[in-house]
């Protein structure tokens, strides 16, 4: 305990540094006598501070509290309205402010002009192009940096260099911001016209990005990269990130492979000491030179020089610097364009008649055949999911926007909302619900648009289609994805794989007679030429499928799906441009359909197959693998002779020529040693990931609270760190302090302590030690966890009112009646709860809940309520186990080579000792027999929590549960009476525990938990047959050992002599574990 609390205390003295400021620590203890002293201590502090007396003597008098109790929070108040930022900033604003080049970007509004030059009046102003969309302010960010600088001003040696570098960069930011004054944010953390009119429009988002970059500077190289990006991104708001990251697609082709990992038959990574030389034709170097020249033209100096220096010997040892540049380029922030430009981008492509019709035909046929292949089993067997597709669609309907705001009546309450789920309920109540009619999206009813912003790319538009489109596509797409799940070609969907498996797949076939072709097809996916052949291929496939069945319901499902494709072939979109709404005929494919991901993958696979079939007319090769991953596709081709420069050049030109014949504007490259796609890149036989998650700017605003965003910030920091981009941890912790503090009044604020923010309760935000998820087992930890659990989820009056209305009740019972054959309270209640949870995305409800949550939290942070909760958490289980473990020192040799060079040392060390894993551990119960049985007869998908609850019921009840979901009685009886059922109990418990312990998140997802090297450090004498207990003991031991190794860089072995008498007690407890959702778990989930 301590680092966070220490920094917190220092931070508060830094912020409130005037005479009138007071900090009062609040302590608690699970020991009732000490707890009494804590309460006395607190009231005396309050008394003294009211009288303006010093608190020093109280601290002495209550030494026992300060030493033995746990810090709960710090209450801080100050009568100074703190414009302290401005005052402090002047001290750092000693440099020359940046001047924006006002002609740096093609689009006028992307130039960093004064706001009043871009938007002459308040009415025209919008912050949508520069909104940081995060619930923390520029002034907080400036404070956090200045706090760090003040704290480290006297550092020595290497640390002093870091201080100097950051100070230098901050001087640029401070001088520029100070020139115009710090923009003040409003209550919603937005920057209004009055504040911004005399300041550069992009000042805030630029300053946020710059702060994020300068707080990630450690080495001299970091400093050079950051300086260049900070200075240039002030002017260039459009192409900088793209320019800096472009060379990577070529750099990966330049590094020889000298030893790599490949996927073996068991789908594990296995070291191979093969040597593959990088064969690079001159043309490639010319293209690279052109990229570097473009960088120089844009004013970059140091970055292109670093790349040129690396090119001298192209070594993998120095490649991490290239990876670093690639990652850093994304931290200049999001490129946010006007919707009109984003839409026109796809419509600008000139359509030519001069295309290869033969290739288009082949492309369409391949799409058609793939659609048929994916669905024919389901259609021939009249799959129940295709029969009840409407119900399945309704059950998984999201609460996203339906594209228009409507007035809805729920009982006596009238509300305005755009949410799909509410529209469906309302339509059903008013007889307007007609899933059999897919509304047109033509000129009479154009599609409203959403947006997707991403660093280094143009803004993309998203269709917000009426909910009928989702219902029509849901079931069919689910079937397509199920097929993709066991098809290796679909890297993104392939069963439980992770990116390491795809990495081993590529390196597996690289040799001196093979080349790999990799293409980024994101331009093609959203190009107009794609739309006709794409939709037609799908339609033709659906027509063939419709002739394979006589089931009217299945035919109807396919017919509706086909209708969505026909409608979308004639689509118009509505784009607000100033005050007018423009209607534009939009020919391209945009995301927003349920089928987007699946259909794009099918089309990309068809595209690369079409291209390869043309290339095969000219060359003789074997296609070893073809893979599609999102917007990228790649294939490894094996020739019967050794690859030469000339061959690489010829194949490369032919491939590009082939794409050109389809008028596909794509970036196609050929290499012998590496690839670069959006998700990952392989160079020198090693795998790299782009560490490009922005911390202080967000893509869009949602309805998450500050706490949620603090957890997301931390989670993003962890992901970046695993991928090789490290931001100063103290800075991150300072941001967490700022974002989790709660204002009580204008001058009174409460700051939660480390214990509150790191205990796994509903309020957890971060881990006290990076990469280690701790489950507190001390009395104080369990005590505070119980206290937080008593703060059960908050009620919302609006939600209750809606849920009590006839409209809502009828909807829920309609779903239940369609789904269930007989009464089943578990499922009915589950559906009602799910539907009620969907209401949370309606702002007034989430606001109401948040207020309740905050006030409960305020009470709790001032005095924890003792509450004897009968709920059992994973902490209780570990608390029971812990005493029986004995630790001794051990030794594990490093025996595996590095293959992910960007990992932090402590994580790398563990992988090198125990090995890595290429699969996700199943943590949703979907592999259990009961789950398979349910999905065989019903469209209902129980969650792991529900399965865990059901499987522990009496056999009679399980049987009733199954029968009510439409499972034939004979199957239900067989299941309950079989061995499979007892295996399931174990299997589901296992999944549930894995789920609770976040085993597929953070760095745990990289470790091989079944490593024999790890097993041999654990000794647990075998007693009695309770596999569940054996499992939890082993898993606990593994986590303890791994956590110890992450922290200390050395190994321990564990011996456990667990008494047989305790085992049955523990086993019973294990069936009552409550799962805890927190901002922290949501952030993990959000990473997914």
From Swiss-Prot:
Interacts with VP3 (Potential). Interacts with VP2; this interaction activates VP1. Interacts with NSP5; this interaction is probably necessary for the formation of functional virus factories. Interacts with NSP2; this interaction is weak. It is an enzyme of class 2 (transferase). This is RNA-directed RNA polymerase. Its cofactor is Mg(2+). It comes from Rotavirus A (isolate RVA/Monkey/United States/TUCH/2003/G3P[24]). Its EC number is 2.7.7.48. Its main location: virion. Belongs to the reoviridae RNA-directed RNA polymerase family. Keywords: Magnesium, Nucleotide-binding, Nucleotidyltransferase, RNA-binding, RNA-directed RNA polymerase, Transferase, Viral RNA replication, Virion. It comes from the Viruses. Residues 501-687 form the RdRp catalytic domain. GO terms for cellular component: virion component. SUPFAM superfamilies: DNA/RNA polymerases.
């Amino acid at each position: 305990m301590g680092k966070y609390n220490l920094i917190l205390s220092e931070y508060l003295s830094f912020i409130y540094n005037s005479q009138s400021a007071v900090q009062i620590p609040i302590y608690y203890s699970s020991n009732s006598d000490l707890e009494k002293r804590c309460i006395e201590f607190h009231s005396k502090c309050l008394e003294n501070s009211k009288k303006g007396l010093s608190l020093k003597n109280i601290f002495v008098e209550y030494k026992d509290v300060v030493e033995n109790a746990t810090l709960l929070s710090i209450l801080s108040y100050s009568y100074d309205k703190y414009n302290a930022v401005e005052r402090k900033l002047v001290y750092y604003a000693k440099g020359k402010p940046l001047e924006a080049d006002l002609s740096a970007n093609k689009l006028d509004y992307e130039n960093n002009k004064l706001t009043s030059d871009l938007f002459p009046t308040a009415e025209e102003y919008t912050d949508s192009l520069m909104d940081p969309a995060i619930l923390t302010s520029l002034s907080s960010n400036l404070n956090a940096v200045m706090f760090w600088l003040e704290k480290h001003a006297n550092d020595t040696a290497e640390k002093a260099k870091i201080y100097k570098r950051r100070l230098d960069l901050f001087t640029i930011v401070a001088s520029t911001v100070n020139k115009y004054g710090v923009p003040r944010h409003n209550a919603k953390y937005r920057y209004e016209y009055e504040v911004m009119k005399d300041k550069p429009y992009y000042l805030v988002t630029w300053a946020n990005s710059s702060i994020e970059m300068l707080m990630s500077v450690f080495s001299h190289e970091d400093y050079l990269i950051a300086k260049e990006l900070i200075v240039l991104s002030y002017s260039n708001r459009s192409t900088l990130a793209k320019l800096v990251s472009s060379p990577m697609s070529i750099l990966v082709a330049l590094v020889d492979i000298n030893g790599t990992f490949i996927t073996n038959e068991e789908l594990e990574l296995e070291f191979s000491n093969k040597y593959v030389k990088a064969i690079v034709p001159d043309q490639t170097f010319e293209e690279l030179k052109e990229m570097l020249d473009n960088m120089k033209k844009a004013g970059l100096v140091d970055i292109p020089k670093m790349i040129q220096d690396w090119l001298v010997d192209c070594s993998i040892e120095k490649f991490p610097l290239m990876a670093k540049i690639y990652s850093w380029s994304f931290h200049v922030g999001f490129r946010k364009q006007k919707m009109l430009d984003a839409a026109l981008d796809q419509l600008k492509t000139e359509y030519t008649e001069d295309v290869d019709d033969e290739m288009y035909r082949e492309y369409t046929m391949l799409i058609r055949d793939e659609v048929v292949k994916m669905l024919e089993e389901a259609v021939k067997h009249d799959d129940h999911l295709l029969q009840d597709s409407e119900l399945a669609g309704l059950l998984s309907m999201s609460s996203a926007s339906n594209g228009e705001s409507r007035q809805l009546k729920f009982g006596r309450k009238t509300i305005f909302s755009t949410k799909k789920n509410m529209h469906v309920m309302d339509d059903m109540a008013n007889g307007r619900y007609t899933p059999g009619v897919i509304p047109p999206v033509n000129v009479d009813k154009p599609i409203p648009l959403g947006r997707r912003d991403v660093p280094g790319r143009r803004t993309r538009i998203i269709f917000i289609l009426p909910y009928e489109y989702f219902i029509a596509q849901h079931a069919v797409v689910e079937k397509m994805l199920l097929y993709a799940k066991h098809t290796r070609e679909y890297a993104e969907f392939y069963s439980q794989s992770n990116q390491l498996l795809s990495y081993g797949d590529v390196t597996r076939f690289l040799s001196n007679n093979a080349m790999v072709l990799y293409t980024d097809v994101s331009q093609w996916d959203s190009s107009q030429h794609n739309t006709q052949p794409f939709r037609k291929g799908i339609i033709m496939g659906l027509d063939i499928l419709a002739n394979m069945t006589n089931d009217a319901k299945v035919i109807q499902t396919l017919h509706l799906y086909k209708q969505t494709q026909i409608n979308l072939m004639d689509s118009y979109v509505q784009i607000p441009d100033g005050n007018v709404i423009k209607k534009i005929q939009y020919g391209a494919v945009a995301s927003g359909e349920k089928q987007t991901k699946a259909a794009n993958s099918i089309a990309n696979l068809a595209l690369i197959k079409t291209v390869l079939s043309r290339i095969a007319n000219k060359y003789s090769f074997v296609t070893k693998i073809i893979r599609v991953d999102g917007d990228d596709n790649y294939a490894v081709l094996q020739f019967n002779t050794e690859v030469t420069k000339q061959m690489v050049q010829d194949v490369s030109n032919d491939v590009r020529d082939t794409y050109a014949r389809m008028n596909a504007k794509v970036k196609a490259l050929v290499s012998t040693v590496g690839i670069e796609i959006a998700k990952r890149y392989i160079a020198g036989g090693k795998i790299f990931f782009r560490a490009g998650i922005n911390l202080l700017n967000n893509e869009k605003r949602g309805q998450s609270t500050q706490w949620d965003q603090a957890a997301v910030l931390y989670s993003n920091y962890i992901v970046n760190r695993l991928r090789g981009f490290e931001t100063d941890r103290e800075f991150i912790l300072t941001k967490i302090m700022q974002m989790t503090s709660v204002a009580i009044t204008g001058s009174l604020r409460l700051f939660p302590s480390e214990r509150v923010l790191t205990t796994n309760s509903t309020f957890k935000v971060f881990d006290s030690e990076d990469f280690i998820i701790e489950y507190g087992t001390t009395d104080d930890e369990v005590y505070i966890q119980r206290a937080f659990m008593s703060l059960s989820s908050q009620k919302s009056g609006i939600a209750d009112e809606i849920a009590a209305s006839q409209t809502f009740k009828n909807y829920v019972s309609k779903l239940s009646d369609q789904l269930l054959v007989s009464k089943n309270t578990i499922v009915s209640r589950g559906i009602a709860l799910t539907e009620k949870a969907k209401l949370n995305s309606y702002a007034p409800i989430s606001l109401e809940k948040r207020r309740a949550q905050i006030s409960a939290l305020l009470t709790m942070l001032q005095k924890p309520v003792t509450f004897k909760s009968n709920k059992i958490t994973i902490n209780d289980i570990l608390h029971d186990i812990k005493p029986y473990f004995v630790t001794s020192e051990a030794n594990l040799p490093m025996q595996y080579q590095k293959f992910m060079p960007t990992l932090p040392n402590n994580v790398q060390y563990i992988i090198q000792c125990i090995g890595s894993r290429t699969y996700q551990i199943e943590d949703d119960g979907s592999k259990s027999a009961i789950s398979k049985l349910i999905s065989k007869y019903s469209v209902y998908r129980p969650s792991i929590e529900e399965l865990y609850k059901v499987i522990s019921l009496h056999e009679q009840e399980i049987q009733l549960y199954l029968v009510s979901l439409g499972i034939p009685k004979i199957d239900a009886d067989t299941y309950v009476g079989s061995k499979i059922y007892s295996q399931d109990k174990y299997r589901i418990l296992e999944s549930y525990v894995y789920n609770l312990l976040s085993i597929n998140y953070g760095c745990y997802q990289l470790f091989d938990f079944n490593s024999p090297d790890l097993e041999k450090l654990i000794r647990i004498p075998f007693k009695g047959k309770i596999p569940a207990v054996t499992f939890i003991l082993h898993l606990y031991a593994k986590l303890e050992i791994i956590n110890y190794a992450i922290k200390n860089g050395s190994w321990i072995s564990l011996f456990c002599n667990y008494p047989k008498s305790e085992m049955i007690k523990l086993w019973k407890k294990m069936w009552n574990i409550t799962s805890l959702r927190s901002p922290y778990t949501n952030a993990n989930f959000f990473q997914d």
